[in-house]
Amino acid sequence: MASLGDLVRAWHLGAQAVDRGDWARALHLFSGVPAPPARLCFNAGCVHLLAGDPEAALRAFDQAVTKDTCMAVGFFQRGVANFQLARFQEALSDFWLALEQLRGHAAIDYTQLGLRFKLQAWEVLHNVASAQCQLGLWTEAASSLREAMSKWPEGSLNGLDSALDQVQRRGSLPPRQVPRGEVFRPHRWHLKHLEPVDFLGKAKVVASAIPDDQGWGVRPQQPQGPGANHDARSLIMDSPRAGTHQGPLDAETEVGADRCTSTAYQEQRPQVEQVGKQAPLSPGLPAMGGPGPGPCEDPAGAGGAGAGGSEPLVTVTVQCAFTVALRARRGADLSSLRALLGQALPHQAQLGQLSYLAPGEDGHWVPIPEEESLQRAWQDAAACPRGLQLQCRGAGGRPVLYQVVAQHSYSAQGPEDLGFRQGDTVDVLCEVDQAWLEGHCDGRIGIFPKCFVVPAGPRMSGAPGRLPRSQQGDQP
């Protein structure tokens, strides 16, 4: 399968070849992509029609509607190809299928998907009448044109009036089609990212192979002897992939009343900048490899989260770049939890959006935009044996602007798209333009049309921008 960069590059060059009228070059680019998406198959079909090869166009449109069974404009153009091949019964069937995919709407605007064309219901009915004329169904053709006139914009009936007059005189009607030279084009947002990007950067040493190294935070695995302390305070497993982020979990730290254990997995590991001297300890987080607090010692949390020896401490598990189990007072406020989390993960604590795991077997993550949501989370956690579980999410360090709910299902047309089902909640990471958003859903990141979603509720604090009011109730 071609990479996203190769796909977008071939797509863009093919569209430029269409603009120049170089049909052979355009077909080579559109058809040369392995397993092309539906929009590229549609482009190839349109170019075959322009080149005067309706048979090849029919095969290309067959692939397009097979890959995307809801592509109304694909059935529309396939009907045109069948019409040019004098297969009028097949053309009539395709035009009816195109009208069915309009789902009662007056038009479908394909501009936001890259095609500068709006498929109108009256145009489809006009082509239905054209095929019926070729089949000798004059009464049905006149009825189809009258229905098309009812869907035509007010005050602009002259074109269909002349067509109806021609049908009543039993004259043929040429079919309408997508304007010459119009094809699906890649979004300009993708064209800006065709150049390679170094996501990993330079490697950093996070674990020393020297046993006597005094660097803090990460140490090589220590030998275990018969007299070694079985309550070892540190265990680090070296990994050649240290310093890169490959998964949602890479280390877990548990701070209890009588022990402190830290484990770094081979998948992922936080980076350590300081080497050569001991760093001052943050309150509430014991040094890795050092002695933990005794049975009567309570780690002090920032902002009062761990203060107050008279109140019992509970474990709060937080998932960020890695999982951290912190000790905090039950019912601690939002600022106290963020301050306590900031001692271990300053960057995520500032940019990430906190969510809590709802109770139940099919529990989902519920955002915590304000203090009231956190207190509700504490109430739910009181009846849950696993305690309060939080998630500090920001999709690779990127903050979540706000959340939207899918009003309609959206099928990804290519690897750059984010598909989802009706009712799914999507985290919005970027407002690409007036018609497109970039979002995160079920561990995947991609772009999707704004008209498929509606706001999920109040915006998260500090999130810029607004979902346009005109898009909130649209349907595709």
UniProtKB/Swiss-Prot annotation:
Keywords: Cell membrane, Cytoplasm, Membrane, Phosphoprotein, Repeat, SH3 domain, TPR repeat. Widely expressed. Detected in pancreas, liver, kidney, spleen, prostate, small intestine and colon. This is NADPH oxidase activator 1. The SH3 domain mediates interaction with NOXO1 and NCF1 and has autoregulatory function. The TPR repeats mediate interaction with RAC1. TPR repeats lie at residues 7-38, 39-71, 73-105, 122-155. Changing S461E: Constitutively interacts with YWHAZ. It is found in: Cytoplasm; Cell membrane. Interaction with YWHAZ depends on phosphorylation by PKA. It comes from Homo sapiens. Residues 315-395 form the PB1 domain. Residues 1-224 are annotated as: Mediates interaction with RAC1. Changing W436R: Loss of interaction with NOXO1 and NCF1. Loss of localization to membranes. Partial loss of function. It holds the Pfam family PB1. The keyword Membrane applies. One of its GO terms (cellular component) is cytosol. Functions as an activator of NOX1, a superoxide-producing NADPH oxidase. Functions in the production of reactive oxygen species (ROS) which participate in a variety of biological processes including host defense, hormone biosynthesis, oxygen sensing and signal transduction. May also activate CYBB/gp91phox and NOX3. Residues 279-288 have a biased composition (Low complexity). InterPro entries: NCF2_NOXA1, PB1-like, PB1_dom, SH3-like_dom_sf, SH3_domain, TPR-like_helical_dom_sf, TPR_rpt. Residues 259-308 are annotated as: Disordered. One of its GO terms (molecular function) is identical protein binding. The modification Phosphoserine is found at S172, S461. The keyword Membrane applies. Residues 260-271 have a biased composition (Polar residues). Changing S461A: Loss of phosphorylation. Loss of interaction with YHAWZ. GO terms for biological process: regulation of hydrogen peroxide metabolic process; regulation of respiratory burst; superoxide anion generation; superoxide metabolic process. Belongs to the NCF2/NOXA1 family. The lineage of its organism: Eukaryota, Metazoa, Chordata, Craniata, Vertebrata. Residues 399-458 form the SH3 domain.
